[in-house]
Design a protein with these regions (language model features):
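Short functional micro-motifs and their immediate structural scaffolds
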Residues: 161-164
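Short Cys/His-rich metal-coordination motifs, predominantly Zn2+-binding knuckles/fingers
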Residues: 156-159
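Residues immediately within or flanking Cys/His clusters that coordinate Zn2+
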Residues: 150-153, 276
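Extended alpha-helical scaffolding segments
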Residues: 1-142, 166-178, 182-623
Length: 623
């Protein structure tokens, strides 16, 4: 039976997997007290998973602080770890709730203090109140645009609690949002800003059980009295109005303000429970929440220091790439920064905890050109030795080995392109009768259709996990250096796997060309083998910049070919001529004049020229 106000302290709502693999919901108190018997928080949405984890981390910080065990040093952390070794003590939780007078602040439908909401909020937009699916960032929450969106599933009260927390942690910016009021006090936001977890990716460590996971991510920091969570410092309409632009602000003004004032959180506790949205769930008589008032909350300054985010050298959160798995950037995530605040703090913290292994979780979204456009969710897990987290030699080696795989990828792609262009030439050595432009377009389409890179990277992922397990064995601890090359088993195994998977993916991709003489000839001329020299970066001469012609001068017309077009055009002409056994002095002159190269250096202009030519013609074309 669900209680009227649904108290998150007492009512079960947190989805967890226990050590016996049974799934069960817990309330806040029972989840923390029984954290030793819970394997992990688990939800189908990774955003919900890490949002609830951050919510519980903020709660644990406050419990430790209220019980005179503030996590201001690693020594205090050791003390907390010893006292909570069998689960977070319920007496500590009760002490915190009583001393901070927040026992009644965890109810979803409380009249005075609804958790994570603005009491008595009324949004006045024409679409307000919205369907409760508005809390689901990945689901329909407004006017349906697709056939399958006509009947969205409304959340239960438990689901509403989960998505209320995740919507505060994760949300995109928009130029428009609803006006709101509480009583006669009006709030006129100019638009919604990004929620704390939207930019970059969230990284957290996972232990053997929920308690270990919490303690691994409860890093020590100088906690201050004003670093308060949302349940101790309720969001009010007055605070929202104070963050509006001050120009022409009146209580009953209907004019939209130009811009809201953004602010920094006072610490991790406030950041983990940041009220980025002003929300109020409408009370329900059943077990389903139907409507919600939803508008902009407190604006957050760009790039606040988040202890669960990795940052680049310029201080910006690292984004997930739509074209790359997170494992390909693991060395950048683990990279030790000179500024400690720019690194995921749990890494150095875990290295001091005495554990042998841990699991790194990376979750976030890959976004499109438009900031609010999500291409897909990503959630990846890596089991790594704890010693690796602060070993700069191993981290650098991971970056080097992944970089070698990137080098092979470039050659792999070029081989596929070369095969596609050779395939467009008839087996008798004469070009097709169709127009040159059409033939080039056909080659481009073939190259795209046989692209072997997706299969290449997908197969390398398994080998990368093996590399993480075994790479520390390549390091000689006594000598303080890497073992001799012939004894670096993990490194040699990885490099062999890279070359084998490149060959395998290319051979499988070109099978779609068939077994005609044309296909066999194209594949044989280019080859599908890879060698160790392909692991190294390919030399590339610096290319001169294309000079823009001034209006009225020769060559300054609209049809002037770009540098890249000249290069591609010449290579295609050269390929067809080489098949016929002819030379083309005109093409050679065009290339030299167009690229500004000295005679005799044509091979450096484009590294793929010479492989197209039979041996007996190379000296002719390179004169």
């Amino acid at each position: 039976m669900i209680e009227k106000d649904f108290d998150l302290l007492k009512n079960d709502w947190i989805p967890c997997i226990q050590l016996d693999n049974e799934q069960r919901d817990f309330c806040i108190i029972s989840a923390l007290v029984n954290s030793c018997s819970i394997r992990a928080i688990h939800h189908e949405s990774p955003v919900v998973t890490f949002s609830v984890l951050r919510f519980l981390l903020a709660f644990c910080y406050r419990v430790a602080y209220a019980t005179k065990k503030p996590l201001t040093s690693f020594r205090n952390w050791r003390r907390v770890h010893e006292e909570w070794k069998n689960g977070i003590a319920q007496k500590d939780i009760e002490t915190y709730l009583d001393e901070c007078k927040c026992r009644d602040r965890f109810r979803l439908f409380d009249d005075r203090y609804p958790l994570y909401q603005v009491a008595n909020l009324v949004c006045t937009g024409k679409e307000q109140p919205e369907p409760a699916t508005r809390l689901f960032f990945e689901q329909f929450g407004g006017t349906p645009t697709q056939l399958w969106e006509h009947a969205p599933m409304l959340p239960t009260i438990k689901e509403a609690a989960l998505y209320l927390i995740s919507s505060q942690a994760f949300g995109a910016s928009t130029s428009n949002t609803s006006k709101a009021k509480v009583g006669e006090i009006h709030y006129l936001p100019s638009g919604r800003t990004f929620a704390p977890c939207y930019k970059g990716c969230i990284v957290w460590l996972e232990g053997a059980n929920l308690l270990e996971t919490l303690l691994l991510n409860l890093v020590d920091y100088d906690m201050v009295d004003v670093d308060l969570p949302i349940w101790e410092k309720q969001l009010t309409i007055q605070e929202l109005r104070a963050r509006q632009a001050l120009c022409k602000q009146e209580v009953n003004s209907e004019k939209k303000e130009e811009k809201c004032h953004k602010t920094f959180p006072t610490g991790p506790v406030q950041l983990f429970t940041w009220p980025s949205r002003a929300i109020l769930l409408e009370k329900t008589k059943g077990e389903v929440v139907e409507r919600v008032h939803f508008t902009q909350g407190l604006g957050l300054m760009d790039y606040p220091l988040d202890p669960m985010k990795p940052y680049d050298a310029e201080g910006r959160p690292m984004e997930l790439d739509k074209n790359k798995g997170a494992w390909r950037d693991l060395h950048a995530i683990l990279e030790l920064k000179p500024n400690r605040n720019r690194t995921v703090l749990a890494f150095s913290h875990a290295a001091r905890c005495g554990l042998s292994r841990t699991i790194i979780n990376v979750a976030g979204v890959a976004r499109g050109a438009k900031a609010a456009k999500i291409l897909f969710w990503r959630y990846e897990r890596f089991s790594v030795p704890v010693a690796m987290l602060e070993d700069v030699n191993i981290i650098d080696r991971i970056g080097t080995l992944v970089g070698e795989a990137d080098n092979v990828e470039k050659i792999l792609r070029q081989k596929a392109i070369n095969i596609a262009y050779r395939y467009t030439v008839q087996a008798n050595g004469r070009p097709d009768t169709k127009d040159q432009h059409d033939r080039n377009n056909d080659a481009d389409k073939i190259a795209e259709s046989i692209d072997p890179r997706p299969a290449y990277w997908a197969r390398l992922e398994k080998h990368f996990f093996d590399l993480l397990q075994n790479l520390p064995n390549d390091w000689d601890t006594e000598a303080g250096d890497w073992k001799p090359d012939d004894q670096q088993h993990a490194t040699r195994t990885w490099r062999k796997a890279v070359l084998n998977e490149a060959r395998r993916s290319l051979e499988e991709s070109v099978r779609s060309l068939g077994t005609t003489a044309r296909a066999i000839s194209a594949i044989a001329r280019v080859g599908t083998d890879f060698s160790e020299k392909d692991l190294k970066p390919q030399p590339q001469d610096s290319q001169p910049k294309e000079k823009k012609s001034k209006p009225g001068k020769k060559g300054g017309g609209k049809n002037q070919m770009s540098l890249d077009e000249k290069r591609k055009s010449f290579i295609r002409r050269l390929l067809s001529l080489a098949e016929e056994g002819k030379e083309d002095r005109g093409a050679l002159a065009d290339l030299r004049s167009g690229l500004g190269k000295e005679p005799g250096k044509m091979a450096r202009v484009h590294k793929h020229v010479v492989p197209y030519l039979p041996e007996k013609y190379r000296t002719v074309f390179l004169r």
